[in-house]
UniProtKB/Swiss-Prot annotation:
Reported temperature dependence: Optimum temperature is 70 degrees Celsius.
EC number(s) recorded for this UniProt protein: 1.2.7.3
The name this protein goes by in its record: 2-oxoglutarate synthase subunit KorA
Assembly notes: Heterotetramer of the KorA, KorB, KorC and KorD subunits.
The keyword Oxidoreductase belongs to this UniProt entry's keyword annotation: yes
Reaction(s) catalysed by this chain's protein: 2 oxidized [2Fe-2S]-[ferredoxin] + 2-oxoglutarate + CoA = succinyl-CoA + 2 reduced [2Fe-2S]-[ferredoxin] + CO2 + H(+)
């Protein structure tokens, strides 16, 4: 039965995880994400799941990786400092194609920064935080409803592409309370199970979509799981240049070749926009209001709300750059996704930045003033 709730974003992430089939959570308390762990500790036992509070964030993501290879869906939640500690395991999960979800409720940074204040300072860390060439998927909610919906989608994407997926929330979205609708059932995708008997199974042999089938430990299949460069059997093959290139390119291509299926943006008034405002997460709320105000004053403004920062929506941004005279990037940092927009729009449109740090969200009038100054 579909029901309505008045809850905060962090609770919605937890409920989204449960609805998506998550049955294992390991984490370490850190502001402003702790409510996710608290809610999972309450909800999981009733669903036959397991909650573990680990000694630190390193152990938390390691435990999730182990649980996922044990056959369940797993998640952890953290904030910037903890996300930094997880990066070695993020790379390991990418290399071993371990599907899992990380919720990063961003706060002011660097270092321990502003534990109780909002930020969007982990955007580049989500994409490039671990060493090496790899691709991940990241989603950026701007409302409590999206915290639920995007967490469900994060699990589906993780399972479909066997990749770590990051939900890039922030303190504002995580702690705001709104009415949301939670359906009785949601679309649930599961990793592909082996279609051949154990004696014939090749664990890292890709299917047509570049994604291998995935058994669980204990199912009777032999599956070596190593962070070393490995062949399709899973055996280390670290001295083979051709083998390494083949593996790493496949890890990237399984995301990049499905970019059109993964990327999600929302647009408003972009058909005739002379100035297009680009944002993601919490600032998108102010952007929509500011653009509406600008249009009421005769300015042909529009907006693009990026729901999937990674993989970056290059096609959509390029189209905006081709049709608009100027682009404005609004984000709660000193400029991170701004550089991606600038890269894609180079030679087509002028790109400006409206940054903000210190823990507060942009006000609509601040954005409106910037738009009016760009006319």
């Amino acid at each position: 039965m579909t029901e309505e709730y008045f809850i905060q974003g962090n609770d919605a992430c937890a409920r989204g995880a449960i609805s998506a089939g998550c049955r294992f959570f390991a984490g370490y308390p850190i502001t402003p994400s702790t409510e996710i762990a608290e809610e999972m500790a309450v909800l999981l036992p009733g669903e036959g799941g397991v909650f573990v509070q680990m000694e630190d964030e390193i152990g938390a993501l390691g435990a999730v990786i182990g649980a996922v290879w044990g056959g369940v869906k797993g998640m952890t939640a953290t904030s910037g400092p903890g996300f930094s500690l997880m990066q070695e395991h993020v790379g390991y999960a990418a290399m071993t194609e371990t599907p899992l979800v990380i919720v990063d409720v961003q706060r002011g940074s660097p270092s321990t920064g502003q534990p109780t204040m909002a930020s969007q300072s982990d955007m580049m860390q989500a994409r490039w935080g671990s060493h090496g060439d790899y691709e991940i998927i990241a989603l950026s909610p701007s409302s409590v409803q999206e915290c639920f919906d995007f967490t469900v989608r994060a699990f589906n994407l993780a399972e479909e592409y066997r990749v770590p997926v990051v939900v890039l929330s922030d303190e504002i979205v995580g702690h705001m309370r709104e009415k949301i609708t939670i359906p009785d059932k949601v679309e649930i995708r599961k990793r592909k199970s082996p279609t051949s008997p154990p004696g014939e199974f090749i664990p890292f042999k890709p299917q047509g979509d570049f994604v291998p089938e995935m058994p669980a430990f204990g199912d009777g299949y032999r599956v070596p799981v190593t962070g070393l460069t490995h062949d399709e059997r899973g055996y280390p093959d670290a001295s083979n240049p051709e083998g390494h290139e083949k593996l790493v390119k496949r890890l990237c291509d399984k995301i990049l070749n499905h970019r059109d299926k993964i990327v999600d943006v929302q647009k408003g008034w972009t058909d005739d926009a002379d100035i297009t405002v680009i944002s993601y997460g919490a600032p998108s709320r102010s952007v929509a209001t500011a653009v509406k105000m600008a249009r009421s004053e005769g300015v042909r403004a529009g907006y693009i709300k990026i729901n999937t920062p990674w993989p970056f929506p290059e096609t959509e941004i390029r189209e905006a750059a081709e049709s608009s005279r100027k682009l404005l990037v609004v984000e709660m940092n000193l400029g991170q996704m701004f550089y991606e927009v600038q890269r894609v729009a180079s030679g087509m449109a002028e790109v400006e930045l409206l940054p903000k740090i210190g823990g507060e969200i942009h006000r609509p009038d601040e954005i409106l003033n910037k738009i009016m100054g760009m006319k």
